[in-house]
Amino acid sequence: NLIQFSNMIQCANKGSRPSLDYADYGCYCGWGGSGTPVDELDRCCKVHDDCYAEAGKKGCYPKLTLYSWDCTGNVPICNPKTECKDFTCACDAEAAKCFAKAPYKKENWNIDTKTRCK
C-alpha cells in the first residue's frame, strides 16, 4: 500500500529524502500523470504508475494491498504470499530502488503540469 511504499522509499534512499518530496514531482510522481516524463526520476514514477495499472488489470488494488517485505542493506526485499501482494510489492520495490538512483532536481518539483506535461 502507499504507506509501505513510502517506507520502502526511505529504505532505498537511506532516509536521505522524505517520501513526500516525491509526491508532487514532474509529470508522474503523485496522483495521475500525463505527457513525457521530465527526467529520470519522473520516468521512475511513470514506470511505477504503469506497474500499478498492470496490477489493476490482474484484479489487484495496489494502493490498498498490504504485503510483507524487509529492508536489507538499504534494499527492499519482498516476501511473496499471493499474486497481488507479490506484484504490488515488486512494483513498489523497483520504484524505490529507481528513486534512490535517480537525481532529484528541485526545479522539477511542483511544476506547472498544464504546460510541461503535454
Swiss-Prot record:
Q: What is this protein called?
A: Basic phospholipase A2 PA-5
The UniProt entry's sequence similarity note says: Belongs to the phospholipase A2 family. Group I subfamily. D49 sub-subfamily.
For this entry, list what GO says about its biological process: arachidonate secretion; lipid catabolic process; phospholipid metabolic process
Q: What keywords are annotated for this sequence in UniProt?
A: Calcium, Disulfide bond, Hydrolase, Lipid degradation, Lipid metabolism, Metal-binding, Secreted
Species this protein is from: Pseudechis australis
- CDD domains according to UniProt: PLA2c
Q: Where does Ca(2+) bind?
A: Y28, G30, G32, D49
Q: Which reaction does it catalyse?
A: a 1,2-diacyl-sn-glycero-3-phosphocholine + H2O = a 1-acyl-sn-glycero-3-phosphocholine + a fatty acid + H(+)
Q: Which PANTHER family match?
A: PHOSPHOLIPASE A2, PHOSPHOLIPASE A2 FAMILY MEMBER
Its tissue distribution reads: Expressed by the venom gland.
EC annotation? 3.1.1.4
Cofactor binding mode and count: Binds 1 Ca(2+) ion.
* Cystine pairs: C11-C71, C27-C117, C29-C45, C44-C98, C51-C91, C60-C84, C78-C89
Q: What SUPFAM superfamilies does the annotation carry? A: Phospholipase A2, PLA2
Give cofactor(s), names only: Ca(2+)
